[in-house]
A protein has these predicted regions:
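Extracellular calcium-associated, cysteine-rich motifs in secreted modular proteins
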Residues: 1-180, 290
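Short, solvent-exposed loop/edge segments of extracellular or virion-exposed proteins
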Residues: 183-191, 279-292
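Core motif of extracellular immunoglobulin-like domains
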Residues: 200, 209-211, 250-252
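Surface-exposed, flexible coil segments in extracellular/virion-facing regions
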Residues: 211-240
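Solvent-exposed loop/turn motifs of extracellular immunoglobulin-like beta-sandwich domains
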Residues: 231, 242-250
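Extracellular interdomain linker/stem segments of modular secreted and single-pass surface proteins
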Residues: 271-278
Length: 299
């Protein structure tokens, strides 16, 4: 009762009935070859019986993409399903007509890059931030599975022994907001005493520049002052560059709405080129031994 037909959950791919039964076995010919139902998360509960087929702490019902929600009991089953279930076992509100088995919605697959429906995809929106994190749940070992592995589940496929999960999820898990660099972030070199700008070209919408003066061991968040300007923008201006900044490293902490994970850019190195040294003027004297007013000499 999660709103996803068992015929789809059995293999995790769309299945279209052929409408024929050549061998008269009572089954549509699409089932001529028996296929064992898949268990995507290997928890011994097949997907068609599993309320969380990928163990990310988000019910399949929420990840399915249909409009029928589970807000009353938050048990992973459609609210009031018993009042609307059809003869075929599917909620009539999800069909174009009762019991015609034609869905009036498309099963969610927002990233479309891995052939996985959202209810099977640990990163449904493809933004390199796991669903469990973006949904607002806890994954201490960062394996994209809710809780700490190895996991245990109940008879409905829900992970047990966890501190949260299986409540209404934050919506970030379904909003594709990857944090990327549009162009390489590379080392820079500027002249001493100049006012110069380092820029980062990223899909992020929030920036915090950081600096390290010890080879990247320790980092400090930059604030705007007489030396720096634009510490929370994509362009960091450095005024009156001093040789003391030579070999400093810079990086940017990046955030984007819709991506809970955030990211940090690679570090780049600043080279400060010293101004040329001007020596004192030297007076040169040369004898003109032939009194023609011209004389050759080497500098």
């Amino acid at each position: 009762n999660d709103g996803i037909p068992d015929i789809i959950e059995a293999q995790g791919i769309p299945v279209t009935l052929l409408g024929t039964d050549a061998d008269l076995d009572g089954l549509d010919d699409v089932f001529t070859t028996f296929v064992t139902p898949v268990d995507s998360d290997l928890d011994n509960v097949p997907d068609y019986l599993d309320l969380d087929s990928d163990n990310d702490g988000v019910y399949d019902l929420w990840e399915a993409g249909h409009p029928l929600l589970d807000v009353t009991l938050t048990d992973g089953q459609i609210d009031d399903v018993d009042l609307n279930i059809g003869i075929n076992g599917l909620d009539n509100r999800l069909e174009t007509a009762p019991d015609n088995f034609i869905l009036n919605y498309t099963i969610s697959d927002p990233d479309t890059d891995d052939s996985l429906f959202s209810y099977l995809d640990l990163d449904s929106d493809g933004d390199n931030c796991p669903d469990v994190t973006e949904a607002g749940f806890t994954d201490p070992d960062n394996d994209s599975i809710i809780g700490t592995s190895p996991t245990s589940v109940d008879n409905m496929g829900r992970v047990t022994g966890i501190s949260n999960g299986y409540t209404i999820p934050d919506t970030d898990y379904s909003i594709g907001a990857p944090i990327l660099l549009n162009t390489p972030f590379e080392d820079v070199a500027f002249c001493e005493a100049s006012t110069s700008t380092i820029s980062i070209d990223s899909t992020a919408d929030t920036f915090q520049w950081e600096v390290s003066s010890d080879g990247g061991t320790n980092w400090t968040s930059i604030i705007d002052n007489t030396t720096y300007n634009g510490a929370t923008t994509k362009d960091l201006e450095i005024s009156n560059l001093q040789l003391s900044l030579d070999n400093n490293q810079y990086r940017v902490f990046l955030q984007r709405a819709g991506n809970t994970c955030n990211d940090t850019s690679n570090a780049i190195t600043l080279t400060v080129e010293p101004l040329p040294t001007v020596t004192a003027l030297v007076e040169l004297k040369q004898c003109d031994d032939d009194t023609d007013g011209f004389s050759l000499f080497n500098l």
